């Protein structure tokens, strides 16, 4: 890879993880809209944005090829349920003052990825990776044993996104095409819920202020733009390099929660964060050491 491609890849990766990191600020703007309604808008408008993007980039041939493989289509239904659940839990957490725990979930996620890789893909742990995973587990167990609480939201986000990544890895479908099919699977449920079941003060778009409707439609942009940046970065950078950017998102979430939204991490959360941060430091050092050996 030449230097120009690498620079472009770095900028795209920074853009993707920066947008993901500050996404909670967008959801805070529409905190008064129920989380399930925000999810339906995210699904509906993401679908239409993906249709537009695939049309502009002329990638419908890939969609046609995918439609000829029923097994992949049905596996994308599973990944759609996983990512939909992840989106719903994240939106609910942010708008119910659990942004810190959401950030913890995405700090834990890389370690869960390692664990699932070992269990389902036959990948072997290096010693330092074992240590990192054990420390992360200890952080959760100490919180449970000492404080009688469990970071359910964090674990839910970490495991749902990790299983989503595992399923997508197994399917091996291009990101944009896969997301179109995922949102297509979720579209009927989202549309039926929004137009037939939801009955809140914001569920009828014809009665909403234009500014609110534009914010709700922006859910599609918040979803698709960072994905496009990420896929662009993935084609220009080595995966080992791209992996180091994944901590930008949860770090920004943590800073937003503490600095702007008044969330104060209690002793139980700080104990768990401390274990996770040490585990991630070991994980990153091991990755750097392994990369240099190659």
UniProtKB/Swiss-Prot annotation:
The chain crosses the membrane at residues 12-34, 38-60, 73-95, 100-122, 129-146, 150-167, 180-197, 212-234, 239-261, 271-290. Keywords: Cell inner membrane, Cell membrane, Membrane, Transmembrane, Transmembrane helix, Transport. The keyword Transmembrane helix applies. One of its GO terms (cellular component) is plasma membrane. Residues 1-11, 61-72, 123-128, 168-179, 235-238, 291-294 are cytoplasmic. Residues 18-145 form the EamA domain. It is a multi-pass membrane protein. InterPro entries: EamA_dom, RarD. It comes from the Bacteria. It holds the Pfam family EamA. Residues 35-37, 96-99, 147-149, 198-211, 262-270 are periplasmic. Belongs to the EamA transporter family. This is Protein RarD.
């Amino acid at each position: 890879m030449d230097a120009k491609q690498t620079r472009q890849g770095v900028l795209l990766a920074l853009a993707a993880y920066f947008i993901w990191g500050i996404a909670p600020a967008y959801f805070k703007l529409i905190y008064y809209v129920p989380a399930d309604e925000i999810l339906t808008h995210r699904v509906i408008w993401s679908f239409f944005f993906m249709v537009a993007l695939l049309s502009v980039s002329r990638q419908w041939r890939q969609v046609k090829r995918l439609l000829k493989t029923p097994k992949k289509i049905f596996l994308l239904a599973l990944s759609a349920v996983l990512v939909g659940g992840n989106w719903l839990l994240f939106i609910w957490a942010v708008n119910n003052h659990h942004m810190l725990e959401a950030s913890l979930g995405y700090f834990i996620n890389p370690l869960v990825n390692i664990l699932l890789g070992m269990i389902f893909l036959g990948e072997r742990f290096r010693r330092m990776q074992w240590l990192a995973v054990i420390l992360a587990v200890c952080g959760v167990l100490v919180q449970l044993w000492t404080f009688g609480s469990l970071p359910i939201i964090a674990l839910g986000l970490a495991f749902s996104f990790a299983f989503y990544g595992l399923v997508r890895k197994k399917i091996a479908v291009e990101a944009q095409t896969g997301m179109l099919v995922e949102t297509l699977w979720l579209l009927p449920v989202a549309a039926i819920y929004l137009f037939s079941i939801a009955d809140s003060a914001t569920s009828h778009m014809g009665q909403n202020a234009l500014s609110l409707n534009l914010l709700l439609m922006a859910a599609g942009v918040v979803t698709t733009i960072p994905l496009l940046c990420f896929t662009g970065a993935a084609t220009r950078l080595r995966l080992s390099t791209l992996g180091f950017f994944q901590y930008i998102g949860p770090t920004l979430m943590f800073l937003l929660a503490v600095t702007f939204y008044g969330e104060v991490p209690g002793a139980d959360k700080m104990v768990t964060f401390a274990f996770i941060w040490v585990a991630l430091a070991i994980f990153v050092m091991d990755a750097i050491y392994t990369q240099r050996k190659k």
